[in-house]
Amino acid sequence: MDPLRQLVLNQHILVRLPSDNLKIVELKPNGVISLGKFGACHVNDIIGYPLGTTFEIWYEGDETEVVRGSTVVIGKVRVLENRAEAQVGSEGATPQPAELTQVESSKTNMELLDLGHKVQKLDHKEIERMKQDVTAGDSIISMMIQSHETFHKKTIHSQEKYLKRKKQKFAKFFTAEYLGSSGLLRYLIEKGDMQRIMDLSEESLGMALNLANIRSNGTYLCMDETGGLIVYAMLERMFGGHEAQHGGTIVVVHENEHPNLDLLKFSNYSEEFIGKHVKTVSLLQYFEPPTVEEVEASFTPLDDAQLREMKSNKKGAYYRRLKRYNSDLEVIRLASQITYDALIVASTLQLSTLVPRLAGKVHGSRPIVCYSQFRETLLELSHTLYDSLHFLAPTLLETRCRPYQTVRGKLHPLMTMRGGGGYLLWCHKVIPADNGAGKIDCDNAAAPACPAAQPDEAP
């Protein structure tokens, strides 16, 4: 089965709940998907269905199996046609919900008195009892509508808003979506983990990949302090979500002892594939790599005959030193012998001194893209790049997407949108000519293109 099209085992997916909140779930064999108050189901029951399928959790009434460590009853699942069918009554829905076809409505809310819980005959205890009896969410909502004394005095639009709120609270369905870099970014934003991703927005991430011209078979230099989110997006651009056989390498430079690529665990790439195409080098190793003579002087690999004669208790130390030897040679190759197709930097370090040094190994006529959540940081960097002949046309960009919400006859922006998504600086690495070609002589530039006409001599 194709993990980009279908739900497969040992895959991380993004589950969208009735409340539109997101949750990351790993599909372990014979496991259970627990969604809290929205119910639970077995993983094996959804395997093989296409990604994007909406499932409804339902109960026959005799279920006794519960999630370990909780009181959530595990139910069965059935497929809904689409999420809009389960979410009828939302603001964007055009047809009238089935729950409201038998209910009267009012043209205005003039006769409606907002008395809160006093107009609802069902109290909190009865609703909790129905939830414990695993009553279907639609049944609970229908009983609440029937028990509402002033529901018929609401307008159609007000009734749909009421129905939407109740579905977000009591409905038992979910949508299984593909967990890509964009979905992972939306999950982290919703979770409120903004410092971890440096206030990065989905629009800024896509713009950075486009400006850097990320594609397959490329070799890219990256400094990612978003936990591996940018590296994950680059892998998707280069390999399309598949563990393809074609080439391509991402060299990640990190400032700490070990790289922080924790978010790559949510990708569907294996550790072997990531280790083959993602190489990590510390800043100290990149700027001051050891020489080949120093590495070869510190260790000499043994041939097969010498290795067979070595005692078994010394082979462990030998293989550790051999691994370090090969690692040092790899660092020398990455830091000294490769020119890169692009540079992407998302770091909290001083960019005005960091980027010019990192760009030294970028090939000519290749893009350089830097991200920061602060405009002043990139302004300082742009002044530094303008003073150098190795960088062409540094440009500062700001991405902003303004979502709109619609109802019948109305269109207005979403009132709870984010403030911004950071800033990007983009330029090209160029190699100045050594022989003076292309330079303009200021003195000659001011001279006229042709000699001025002389006045006729007097006879």
Swiss-Prot record:
GO MF assignments: RNA binding; tRNA (adenine(58)-N1)-methyltransferase activity
Disulfide bonds: none
Annotated GO biological process: tRNA methylation
Keywords on record: Nucleus, RNA-binding, tRNA processing
InterPro entries documented for this protein: TRM6 (IPR017423)
Signal peptide positions (record): none
Segments passing through the bilayer: none
Location(s) in or outside the cell: Nucleus
One GO CC term on file: nucleus
UniProt family annotation: Belongs to the TRM6/GCD10 family.
Known partners and oligomeric status: Heterotetramer; composed of two copies of TRM6 and two copies of TRM61.
Function as written in the Swiss-Prot or TrEMBL entry: Substrate-binding subunit of tRNA (adenine-N(1)-)-methyltransferase, which catalyzes the formation of N(1)-methyladenine at position 58 (m1A58) in initiator methionyl-tRNA.
Protein name per UniProt: tRNA (adenine(58)-N(1))-methyltransferase non-catalytic subunit TRM6
Record organism: Eremothecium gossypii (strain ATCC 10895 / CBS 109.51 / FGSC 9923 / NRRL Y-1056) (Yeast)
Lineage: Eukaryota, Fungi, Dikarya, Ascomycota, Saccharomycotina
Gene for this chain: TRM6
